[in-house]
Swiss-Prot record:
It comes from Spathiphyllum wallisii. Belongs to the universal ribosomal protein uS7 family. InterPro entries: Ribosomal_uS7, Ribosomal_uS7_bac/org-type, Ribosomal_uS7_CS, Ribosomal_uS7_dom, Ribosomal_uS7_dom_sf. Pfam families: Ribosomal_S7. It is found in: Plastid, Chloroplast. Part of the 30S ribosomal subunit. One of its GO terms (molecular function) is structural constituent of ribosome. NCBIfam families: rpsG_bact. This is Small ribosomal subunit protein uS7c. One of the primary rRNA binding proteins, it binds directly to 16S rRNA where it nucleates assembly of the head domain of the 30S subunit. The keyword Chloroplast applies. GO terms for cellular component: chloroplast; small ribosomal subunit. GO terms for biological process: translation. Keywords: Chloroplast, Plastid, Ribonucleoprotein, Ribosomal protein, RNA-binding, rRNA-binding.
Length: 155
């Protein structure tokens, strides 16, 4: 066991334009090869497209999409007596948001379309409405957890 103290949680910084932590989390997840300015560009273009499509506050659409995709429970593989069980575990809010962002970006990358900003904006609008690939992924995870409810005591 380590004698060091526990590391304190780092608070996520907010982005320069919208002053929003969720936007910054999105930027950091979309980032590839250290090109942060390109990541910001993609996110801001996607937010503008959301504004044009919905004619509402794009940050509220973003919040609604992430809230809709955030899972409450997930399954974790746990080895017990030679066999591996999928054990349902509860997920904290920060980890849930991170998963939701990962699923949203994965679903938007798989979408057909012109560019990433267009695909991301479409996925976010769909997720806010309650449809789309990321929402399906969340429902799939919840079904998996419900199916393996019998193994919850292995936690």
């Amino acid at each position: 066991m380590s004698r060091r103290g526990t590391a304190e949680k780092k608070t996520a910084k907010s982005d320069p334009i919208y002053r929003n932590r969720l936007v910054n989390m999105l930027v950091n997840r979309i980032l590839k090869h250290g090109k942060k300015s390109l990541a910001y560009q993609i996110i801001y273009r996607a937010v503008k497209k959301i504004q044009q499509k919905t004619e509402t506050n794009p940050l509220s659409v973003l919040r609604q999409a992430i809230r809709g995709v955030t899972p409450d429970i997930a399954v974790k593989a746990r080895r017990v007596g030679g066999s591996t069980h999928q054990v349902p575990i509860e997920i904290g809010s920060t980890q849930g948001k991170a998963l939701a962002i990962r699923w949203l970006l994965g679903a938007s990358r798989k979408r057909p379309g012109r560019n990433m900003a267009f695909k991301l904006s479409s996925e976010l609008v769909d997720a806010a409405k309650g449809s789309g690939d990321a929402i399906r992924k969340k429902e799939e995870t919840h079904k998996m957890a419900e199916a393996n409810r019998a193994f919850a005591h292995f936690r």
